[in-house]
């Protein structure tokens, strides 16, 4: 980086801290330790060393992203080609995030639907286990307004059919938080 220059009036440690590259903001304070260790006395020797380190790091990252000798070939083959610029990369990232959010909402809706179905099934099992509610299970009526009619019809149906049938189903004693673990 031949554009490196010392800030006017800077000397000693201040010279290292005041180094700037044309077109770039000043180096953050958190990286000043790197400059001090790399400079070794002369500021120009330190920058050359940093340039070599940066070039080597860039080569390694390029090889890894291309799947070169670094062993990243399988990973690079699974990823789509790099977008040509930052705007394209951001657009691609935004598109992937929207897709992930839609998938997340879809899975959440399916999970909630499954939870509601399980709660209905538990209610049906509990209704079936009670001795006076066989009609509700057979016809799917669970409305409180029709409770009177259900009881009357179930009593009438029992007399017509003869001895009562055993419609008991196994009732699980799962709490509301255990149903997820049980379903997996």
From Swiss-Prot:
Name of the protein described by the UniProt record: Protein FAM89A
- Stretches with biased composition (Low complexity): 167-184
Tell me its family.
Answer: Belongs to the FAM89 family.
Lineage, top-rank taxon, reads Eukaryota
Q: Residue ranges of region Disordered?
A: 148-184
The primary gene name is: FAM89A
Q: Which organism is it from?
A: Homo sapiens (Human)
Q: State where composition is biased (Basic and acidic residues).
A: 154-164
């Amino acid at each position: 980086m031949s554009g490196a220059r010392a800030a006017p009036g800077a000397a000693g440690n201040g010279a290292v801290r005041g180094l700037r590259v044309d077109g770039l903001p000043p180096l953050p304070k958190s990286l000043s330790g790197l400059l001090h260790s790399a400079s070794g006395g002369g500021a120009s020797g330190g920058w050359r060393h940093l340039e070599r380190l940066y070039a080597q790091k860039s080569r390694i990252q390029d090889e890894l992203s291309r799947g070169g000798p670094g062993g990243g070939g399988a990973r690079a083959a699974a990823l789509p080609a790099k977008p040509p610029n930052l705007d394209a990369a951001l657009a691609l990232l935004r598109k992937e995030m929207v897709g992930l959010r839609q998938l997340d909402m879809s899975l959440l809706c399916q999970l909630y639907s499954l939870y509601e179905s399980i709660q209905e099934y538990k209610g049906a099992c509990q209704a079936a286990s009670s001795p006076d509610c066989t009609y509700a299970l057979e016809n799917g009526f669970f409305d409180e307004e029709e409770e009177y009619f259900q009881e009357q019809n179930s009593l009438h149906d029992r007399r017509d059919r003869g001895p009562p049938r055993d419609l008991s189903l196994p009732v699980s004693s799962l709490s509301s938080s255990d149903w997820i673990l049980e379903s997996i």
